[in-house]
């Protein structure tokens, strides 16, 4: 792949996995309330993906690194609607609307050149500069994602009580709750993957969901932020019917819900609530003071669980779309 052409006073140089930590530093500097983990970034920048094409760049100004840029899209054979995702960030000292505009222009050119028909971009809902830049470029708001934070100190007794109640209910209903580390089924990863694919199809979205290969799912299970003894699953006999996982950043960041899902056959039976209660009770035992989670604004069942657990809403995100 050729480097993207320079725009404005910025230049774009193809990035390597070793540049991922710098990208994490940039995102952390822009949004210190949501630190990003360099080890996690580098791991994921190092991984292939069977169904996606990625292009990443270090953005320079006068030869100095000031940011990064990304252009990615699913392989068109798995997503014929041809959505292309563009993004990037700049250090706060260099972060202007004009320079963000230059990043978007360069990345849009790249994905459109690859055949994208609809452009997608993301902004935190309190990021005025990025939002104004996207609107000027013709993007329209598509969907909102809600973000929540749970104070584990203030809600400790309530959460432990909910955990105990859920354990009792699951026991009566024949649902076994355990960690991935405690499960001895050699096919457990495949079962969790199949469950997650089923649940993923039910998450509200505008962009068609791209199937996730089992190899990608296995890489996630082995990622540095994931611990098998903190990875909770629900079983009914041989079937895996639920999963909930908190990610623990190795270097910096807030512990965050990576994924919660249940099979269609057990929804409304308290399985998701039981799993989420186990994850936060374990976090309390590990000395974590708060956890965060995010969900599509239209995902009412999970939003309701968040509210009952004591999560408080914090600034979320907005997905923007623009036809080519």
Segment roles from a protein language model:
Residues 96-109, 262, 268-281, 304, ...:
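Conserved acetyl-CoA-binding loop-helix of GNAT-fold acetyltransferases
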Residues 137-159, 230, 281-324:
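Active-site/acyl-donor-binding loops of N-acyltransferases
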Residues 1-5, 92-185, 318-322:
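Acyl-donor-binding surface of acyltransferase catalytic domains
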Residues 1-44, 52, 165-211:
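Short amphipathic alpha-helix that is part of the acyltransferase structural core
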Residues 47-51, 222-227:
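Short loop/turn motifs at secondary-structure junctions and domain boundaries
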Residues 23, 107, 130, 192, ...:
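Aromatic/hydrophobic pocket-lining residues that form π-stacking "cages" and hydrophobic walls in ligand
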Residues 241-260, 268-278, 282-292:
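Extended hydrophobic/aromatic segments used for targeting, binding, or gating
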Residues 16-20, 27-126, 236, 240-263, ...:
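Conserved donor-binding loop and adjoining core beta-sheet/short helix segment
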């Amino acid at each position: 792949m050729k480097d993207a052409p320079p725009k404005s006073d910025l230049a774009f140089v193809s990035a390597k996995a070793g540049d991922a930590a710098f990208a994490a530093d940039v995102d952390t500097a822009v949004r210190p309330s949501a630190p990003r983990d360099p080890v996690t970034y580098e791991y994921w920048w190092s991984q292939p993906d069977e169904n996606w094409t990625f292009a990443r760049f270090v953005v320079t100004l006068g030869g100095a690194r000031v940011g990064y840029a990304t252009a990615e899209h699913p392989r068109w054979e798995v997503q014929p609607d041809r959505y292309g995702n563009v993004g990037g960030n700049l250090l706060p000292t260099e972060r202007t609307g004009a320079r963000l505009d230059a990043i978007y222009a360069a990345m849009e050119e790249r994905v459109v050149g690859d055949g994208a028909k609809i452009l997608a971009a993301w902004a935190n809902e309190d990021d005025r500069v990025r939002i104004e830049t996207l609107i000027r470029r013709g993007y329209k708001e598509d969907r909102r994602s809600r973000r929540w934070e749970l104070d584990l100190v203030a809600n400790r007794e309530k959460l432990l009580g909910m955990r105990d109640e859920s354990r009792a209910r699951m026991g009566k209903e024949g649902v076994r709750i355990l960690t991935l580390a405690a499960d001895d089924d050699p096919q457990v990863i495949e079962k969790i993957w199949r469950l997650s694919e089923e649940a993923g199809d039910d998450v509200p979205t505008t962009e068609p969901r791209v199937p996730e290969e089992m190899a990608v799912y296995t890489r996630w299970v082995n990622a540095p932020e994931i611990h098998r003894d903190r990875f909770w699953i629900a079983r009914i006999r041989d079937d895996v019917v639920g999963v909930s996982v908190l990610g623990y950043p190795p270097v910096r960041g807030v512990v965050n819900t990576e994924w919660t899902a249940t099979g269609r056959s057990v929804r409304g039976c308290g399985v998701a609530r039981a799993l989420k209660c186990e994850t936060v009770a374990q976090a309390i035992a590990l000395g974590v003071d708060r956890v965060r989670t995010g969900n599509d604004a239209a995902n009412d069942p999970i939003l309701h669980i968040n509210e009952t657990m004591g999560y408080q809403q914090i600034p979320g995100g907005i997905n923007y779309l623009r036809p080519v």
